[in-house]
Amino acid sequence: SQLVFAADAKHGGIELPDGNVGFQPGSTFKAIVLAEWLKTGHSAGYTVNASAPKNYAPHTFTVSCDPKRAAGPWPVHNVAGTNAGVMTVREATKQSINAGFTEMLKDLDVCEVTKLAASIGITKADGSPLDPDPSIALGGTLVPPLSMANAYATFASGGKYCKPIAIDRILDASGTSMAAPSADCTQAMDQGTADETARTLRATSEPGGTAKDAVFGRPIAGKTGTTDEAENTWFVGFTPQLSTAVWIGDATESGRSLVGRTIGGVTYDKIYGSDLAVPMWRDYMSQALANDPALPIPSHG
């Protein structure tokens, strides 16, 4: 199964709604950790020790809103074959290095990460707030694809979050236009944080990045995601005009891996967000933006 959601980066309009179910977002949630990292005065040029495996003891992470939450021991691994050591946050983002982001989380408050997520529309599938568990850094919760598309639209729009609306226009019986509901927009994060988040997420589309195959003749930014055993694969990406989330997984059988499945005539012995979600995103976006100009990212400075 696959779901594709697109959100107008300026107005919050939904381009292609297909339901509002929840799936683990995997590494696409790293963009939220990155935004909180930058919001708190850190830089994408700072270095972290991204080597793995790591095993975090209870109470390693700050959870100010729930101090009794032990959250450990928690083993963290990088993708097999990844050669990661001390690297910049930008490089950890480009390569989607798990241990790099858990090390970043040690310098943050998990509750502030969930608060930031809520401010840009990321909640559980039932609308309730995310649990302040450190595992959210690697996407250990259930969220709707629409929420992820709209959150990334906030990065594209200089920090402005607009609640998604499905109605583009209203016509009466005579064909006369009537006032359509407008998106409820707020400045969820300062423009500098949003722009630097967008700028850092551009790294994934560069050679050696997990989303290098998403490029279609214009600047793009985004983040791939793959959950344990490849039960969910994602790409959430944006241009200044449009943010789109692509999820591929098995919506009918919870917990069923995509490994060993035949998709489009190809049987995958391993599969990541870069394999199917990225090219699907690219093909959709290239058509959706065929008549729109190529703009820089960020487009606000």
Task: Give short role names for the model-derived ranges.
Residues 36-40, 107, 119, 154-158, ...:
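Active-site catalytic microenvironments for nucleophilic, acid-base chemistry
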Residues 87, 91, 108, 112-115, ...:
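Generic alpha-helical secondary structure signal
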Residues 89, 101, 135, 145-148:
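Short runs of predominantly hydrophobic/aromatic residues within well-ordered alpha helices
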Residues 77-79, 103-104, 138, 222-224:
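Thr-Gly-centered strand-to-loop micro-motif
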Residues 98-119:
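A small/polar active-site loop signature that marks catalytic segments
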Residues 2-29, 47, 91, 142-301:
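A penicillin-recognizing enzyme superfamily signal
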Residues 1-87, 95-96, 115-137, 141, ...:
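Short pre-catalytic segments that frame enzyme active sites
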